[in-house]
From Swiss-Prot, chains A, B:
GO molecular function annotations of the record: DNA binding; zinc ion binding
Protein name per the record: Recombination protein RecR
Boundaries of every Toprim domain copy: 83-177
InterPro entries: DNA_Rcmb_RecR (IPR000093), Rcmb_RecR (IPR023627), Rcmb_RecR_Znf (IPR015967), TOPRIM_dom (IPR006171), TOPRIM_RecR (IPR034137)
Top-level taxon in the UniProt lineage: Bacteria
A Pfam family recorded for this sequence: Toprim_4
Transmembrane portions of the chain: none
This protein's UniProt keywords: DNA damage, DNA recombination, DNA repair, Metal-binding, Zinc, Zinc-finger
Keyword RNA-binding among record annotations: no
Family annotation (Gene3D superfamilies): 3.30.60.80, 3.40.1360.10, 6.10.250.240, RecR Domain 1
Protein role: May play a role in DNA repair. It seems to be involved in an RecBC-independent recombinational process of DNA repair. It may act with RecF and RecO.
Zinc finger residue extent: C4-type: 60-75
Cystines in this chain: none
Length: 201, 201
């Protein structure tokens, strides 16, 4: 919805906000008007934070979690069990598990799910690096925490077969309703799903 | 909700998004992760749009609508009836009326409502400029389109008394439910409210 009554710099800004996920035209307008009301220093800080996060945040060399250093804070944390790896599709899933405060191991973020429909094969995901990581160090258990869907199940089975020769592979329990997004599941359900994980090999 | 697992530039960016109206911690996280996935050029454009809108968008000298020039596009538009002024509290209310596509006159944005509880007196609003504008030029009618609330009614009565010597003053009909925000009322209701306006003097 473009209105002739917006002045150009404002309509441009609203256009940017409309591209964000879950932001409709009215929310975009509200956010843009909010920006105009802020002191200039706040907007400069925000603008710098955007560029800084975008250029400085990369992937952990070990687990592919987001980090601004070589290794992420979870991989560097000696309090966490480095022999227990939880495999997730995306960083947002890792953050959801962290909110559940149930898991004390480390992660491996594969970057998506195998999906022939979207031409996403295993070679596009961080699966080879996972196999390498597991084969090179002593790992007690791999927990697969992927969304319960056709793609999630396919990916779980694929990784399960590859890792079976090296270590124990489990999958978090089907406590999650089918088709739901891991990101939005409540903490208690996620904790239950971790507890009730079942053996795959 | 601050998580130790966010890397600093990311948590800083999330913090900025959390300050936006109507954006909670999870939406802020989703928006920040979305930013990281965008190409750098998009983020540079967005960052520039923020600064440009903030520094270039000011107030119209005539009606105090947002504009990047001296006079806003509505005031400069010769197709619009310059003798019919609609008084609104905020720019977002003006935009809501524009969406209703019912009003063909011009506006005066007073910048808020009289509210003794919040120490907002008439002198903090663009009411003096409105009286001056009405007294200096030939105006057929002033339509007051303020939120139906104690503050809105007070402001309407105050402006109504001040302008009565100069011209006809009307108020949009009470078709709006009490306590609602003008910004969120649907277009049809707004159009009805404009049609059914009543005489104040």
């Amino acid at each position: 919805m473009i209105l002739i009554t917006y002045t150009k710099p404002l309509s441009k800004l609203i256009g940017h906000f409309e591209k964000f996920p879950g932001i409709g035209p009215r929310t975009a307008q509200r956010l843009a008007l909010f920006i105009l009301k802020q002191p200039e220093s706040t907007i400069r800080d925000f603008s710098e934070a955007l560029l800084e996060a975008h250029s400085n945040v990369g992937r952990c060399k070990k687990c592919f979690n987001l980090t601004s250093e070589d290794e992420c804070e979870i991989c560097k944390n000696t309090q966490r069990n480095q022999k227990l790896i939880c495999v997730v599709a995306e960083t947002k899933d890792l953050l959801a598990l962290e909110r559940a405060r149930e898991f004390k191991g480390v992660y491996h973020v594969i970057g998506g799910l195998i999906s022939p429909m979207d031409s996403v094969g295993p070679e596009l995901l961080e699966i080879r690096s996972l196999v390498e990581r597991v084969s090179k160090s002593e790992i007690d258990e791999i927990i697969l925490a992927l969304t319960p869907s056709v793609e999630g199940d396919t990916t779980s089975l694929y990784i399960g077969k590859l890792l079976a020769p090296f270590t124990k592979v489990t999958r978090i329990a089907y406590g999650l309703p089918m088709g739901s997004e891991l990101e939005y599941v409540d903490e208690v359900t996620l904790a239950r799903a971790l507890e009730g994980r079942t053996n795959l090999n």
